[in-house]
Amino acid sequence: MEGIKFADVLRSFEKKAEDDEYVSVERDYNERKVIENDVRRTELLGVDKRNRKVIKVLKRLLFVELDKIPIKYTQGMSEIASVFVLYYFQNIVEEEVAKGVLASGSDEESAEESAADGFSEQFIEAPEDENVELKRFVSRHKDTTAILGIVLTNVFRRKLEPLVVDDFKLYKENMRIFVEMMKKKGIRIPELESYKFMGSILTFFLRNLSRMEDVHKVFEIILSCPNTCPFLLLVLFYDKISNGKTIDSIVNNDLFPKVVKLEEEFVETKKRVESRSGFSRMRVMLVGGIASIVAAVVVYKITKKE
């Protein structure tokens, strides 16, 4: 995707689709608790872990946005959303904390306490002063906040939701094609083992990346390509992911041409699998039909004797 950057791709997600809803929703406590726990665990890539106040504000904002968008929450969404929160708000928050617009954390806290703070934050039952501070922050940046909400809704609705609805139907179908593609490369992946890649695919590989430049490169490809794209990237990243290694230095790699080439292979493999499945279904129907005819003949003979 030569000449196309993350920012360019993102612009197409900043606009509301005519037929979609973007109204805020109210979730039940259990779903909010899942979101809260996910946000606590989410690492904000590229943010200094010692900067307690910046992390706290960004995570509060992350929770609030995930809590209100009209998309059923799936675990892992907080990690994807964090990329967009950082894109739109990291510089703003860091600048306001540095200028004292957002009150900084206590100087008496140790670095260890500050680093661990992200794992003990309360979002559902946050202190009133924190809620007031966040509301003022959102009010100051309401236009950017509105864009963030639209982007999150569009990204999840177009790119993640299709994979997880109907009990992960499309995810399972695409994973089956991925397994067939790897088999052609001489790598056999048992069905149960294939599910260990779910954490990579459903976070757009954020868990396997260590640099934001690489994250943006992967995201721009996923956002601009069909929803088979994560499975094609999994083909390319398989060796590193299966060996627990970090995917790095891919900014200057020709990922997009490789994905396009693999898309053709994916389509051909899918046709072959469906053709084979169709033959199996016909065989079952044929055997079932013959069995029915035989049973009917037997019943007819028994009835005739009686």
UniProtKB/Swiss-Prot annotation:
GO terms for cellular component: membrane. Signal peptide: none annotated. Glycans are attached at N208. The chain crosses the membrane at residues 218-238, 284-304. It is a multi-pass membrane protein. SUPFAM superfamilies: Ypt/Rab-GAP domain of gyp1p. It holds the Pfam family RabGAP-TBC. Keywords: Glycoprotein, Membrane, Transmembrane, Transmembrane helix. InterPro entries: Rab-GAP-TBC_dom, Rab-GAP_TBC_sf. The keyword Transmembrane applies. It is found in: Membrane. This is Uncharacterized membrane protein ECU10_0880. It comes from Encephalitozoon cuniculi (strain GB-M1).
